[in-house]
Each structure stands twice: as structure tokens, then as C-alpha cells.
Amino acid sequence: WVIGQQQQKRIASAQNSSVGIGSTAPEILLKNPDGEAIALSSFKGKYVLLDFWAGWCAPCRRENPNLVKAYNKYNDKGFEIYQVSLDKSRDEWLRAIKTDNLTWTQVSDLKFWGSPIAKLYYIKSIPANFLIDPYGKIVAQNLRGQALDAKLNEIFK
């Protein structure tokens, strides 16, 4: 049993290393609410928060005001948000974007937990996020609230 547990940890570690700190963020190409495909790589040259969320996810919705604050504070300094929704209902997704005043890039394949992008990034729960540097490297993971502001303040001071 202990050996099995160690093996599972090794497998999880190997999987997560492809999206761990220092790794190049895998490309994402998903459609925004207008049906336009937007690539994550189109934001190269800026710091990007890749954020996984959903309209039905209460903890995600509670975190959105922190993202709005960070976006408003750092966007003109070179900070963007690329938010990937794991919604399955287009209406619920669009309603949440409007209600939470989310003005940055929103994309989804509306495939819920079956989204290939969620699998690519080993997303097991949301909210989940990755801070990506201007060169496409992951520099931090799961920064929320004050931790996100502190990291961005350090970067953009």
C-alpha cells in the first residue's frame, strides 16, 4: 500500500510538472462569447493570469471581485486575465460574466469537467489559476486575494 501511494505521488508529480512553475504554459485556443477563437499565446509580452472558473462555482464567484481589483490596478502596466470557464450552460456563463463585471478575455468550450483544456492543465477543482510571465513561463499557481495583489505589486513596482 505504501509503495502504491508513493507510485501515485510520482505519477501526479510527473503529470503536474508539465504545468508546474518554470514550465512553458501549454497553448489554449478557445472561443469567446462572440465565437471568436482567442489563443493564450496572443498575450505573449504581458503577464497573464490564466484563471479556471465557472458561473456555478461559488468560491470562483467570491474570488472574482479580487480579480476585478487586480485587473483595474495592473492592466495598464501589462497585466491581462485569460479566464477559462468550465460552465456547460452558455446562459449561466454569460450571466456570471455580466453580473461580476468581468471585462477581460473570457473563453470556454462549454464542456464542463470534460474540457480537454481542464485535463491539459490537470484541473481537479476550481478556482485554479496560473500566473504566466511575458515569455510564456508559469511563474506562480493558485494566487488568490491578497497573495495575487502582493505578487503583482512585486512584479510591477
Q: Where does each model-flagged region fall?
A:
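N-proximal helix/coil linker or "cap" segments that precede and/or mark the start of modular domains
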Residues: W1-K31, S41, K46, N72, ...
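Generic structural signal for well-ordered beta-strand positions
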Residues: I38-A39, V139
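Thiol-/selenol-based redox modules, centered on thioredoxin-like
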Residues: D133-K157
